[in-house]
Amino acid sequence: MKYILSIDQGTTSSRAIIFDRNANIKGFAQKDFKQIYPHPSWVEHNPNEIWSSLLEIISEALANARTHPNEIATIGITNQRETTIIWDRYTGQPIYNAIVWQDRRTAKICDELKTQGKDKIFLEKTGLVLDPYFSGTKIKWILDNVSQARERAEKGELCFGTIDTWIIWNLTKGKIHITDYSNASRTLLLNINSLNWDDDLLQILNIPKSILPELKQSSEIYGKIDSSIMGTEINISGIAGDQFAATFGQSCLQKGMAKNTYGTGCFTTVNIGHKPIINEQKILTSIAWVKKNITTYVFEGSIFIGGAVIQWLRDNLELFKKSSDAEILAASVNNNGGIYFVPAFVGLGTPHWDPYARGTIIGLTRSSTKEHITRAALESIAFQSFDVLTEMKNSIKGFDIKELRVDGKASQNNLLMQFQADILQCNVVRPKITETTALGAAYLAGLAIGYWENTEEITSLWKSDKIFEPLMKQSQREDLIYNWHKAINRAKSWIE
């Protein structure tokens, strides 16, 4: 069989990409879906709309590749992480909308748990901080607030899943209820040392174990899709949360290698090898993948608003019509005009972990223009990534980043990538294939069935497209960073 189908279910769109053995894209399709904002800081998706979008793009990608389902060797799945769905085990219907990773409604639950001193337990067992970002408190909220949900969960009538679980449930017509360790490591429920759902954590959050999916490796044959989906049965053999799939797709397979994904949010991962290292409260430790019974761990810095700040300028302020116009506007001025934009629309992630921070544009004068604001918005993405990598340097003994591999839509923005290199004072390397999230899922799926022989083969497929080298004077860089930190401190703890 010729190809691998990779399903990349993201925060704002679903994508299907068909790869060949040389990692060339043979077919592509993408479909946006609705973002639901019931209240300030609440973010939801319609799970059925996500599923219907996948059916559309699978068909479209096959048509674009001019291929038939019989030529698909296997399917790999990657997904927005932490986003939480609970559905009826018998009807397959969700009992509530998907609560998205950006959603902050459970901040008070996290505060109460911290007051009880539970944050240390969660950190030691899961490598995560107590934050609304993760699935555990979202599950608790649904069970506590949706009519009869807790009662039905305790009777075994409900299933929980992150998006990967929901996709596979639907692809197999409810026959398979699984997740992989990488997605599970973002729930606040998985012990990343023992690789088991943790009974103590389930008890703290009052979540019945019966709703949880079975744990699987990131690269193994899980089963086949139902023949009604594509007209034939096809193996599913790869799963990884989006940032971990991107890490694999970037061939960051050796300890110390780092990548940054510039998507809706911005996510930096550093491969830390095969033993978990728990950081004191600021940098997350997660499972990147489990393959052939070997676990690879990463440090991660999570920035909630990355490329989404450009979407906000486009849709909410209507400063431009296309996201690609942002680079043109920003490049038309020599600097940010003294403006600093802290896009804390849903709080701040790594290293601040402040759910009560809010967005701030500071330094405005009568001479400020939309060009300056747009440039400040782009620069905010690089500044936030700088803060994450600085914290990582402080956390990993002997770690000094020499090269940052980048991907995601915003990595195509040359102005942003050059500014990132300048602020970090290291090379920023963009690969020829920037669809690394989908590619990572394809690699994991392909390795499970022998489509690719080993990781050495896939590493040989990685090629650099452009290297951005630091050019900025040190004094200018230091001034920018100093003012950025002044601005971010103004944004913190805004909501009381």
Swiss-Prot record:
It catalyses: glycerol + ATP = sn-glycerol 3-phosphate + ADP + H(+). GO terms for molecular function: ATP binding; glycerol kinase activity. ATP binds at T11, T12, S13, T264, G307, Q311. Belongs to the FGGY kinase family. One of its GO terms (cellular component) is cytosol. Keywords: ATP-binding, Glycerol metabolism, Kinase, Nucleotide-binding, Transferase. Its EC number is 2.7.1.30. This is Glycerol kinase. The gene is glpK. Glycerol binds at R81, E82, Y133, D242, Q243. ADP binds at T11, R15, T264, G307, N413. It holds the Pfam family FGGY_N. One of its GO terms (biological process) is glycerol catabolic process. InterPro entries: ATPase_NBD (IPR043129), Carb_kinase_FGGY (IPR000577), Carb_kinase_FGGY_CS (IPR018483), FGGY_C (IPR018485), FGGY_N (IPR018484), Glycerol_kin (IPR005999). It comes from Borrelia duttonii (strain Ly). Inhibited by fructose 1,6-bisphosphate (FBP). SUPFAM superfamilies: Actin-like ATPase domain (SSF53067). Pathway: Polyol metabolism; glycerol degradation via glycerol kinase pathway; sn-glycerol 3-phosphate from glycerol: step 1/1. It is an enzyme of class 2 (transferase). Sn-glycerol 3-phosphate binds at T11, R81, E82, Y133, D242. It comes from the Bacteria. Key enzyme in the regulation of glycerol uptake and metabolism. Catalyzes the phosphorylation of glycerol to yield sn-glycerol 3-phosphate.
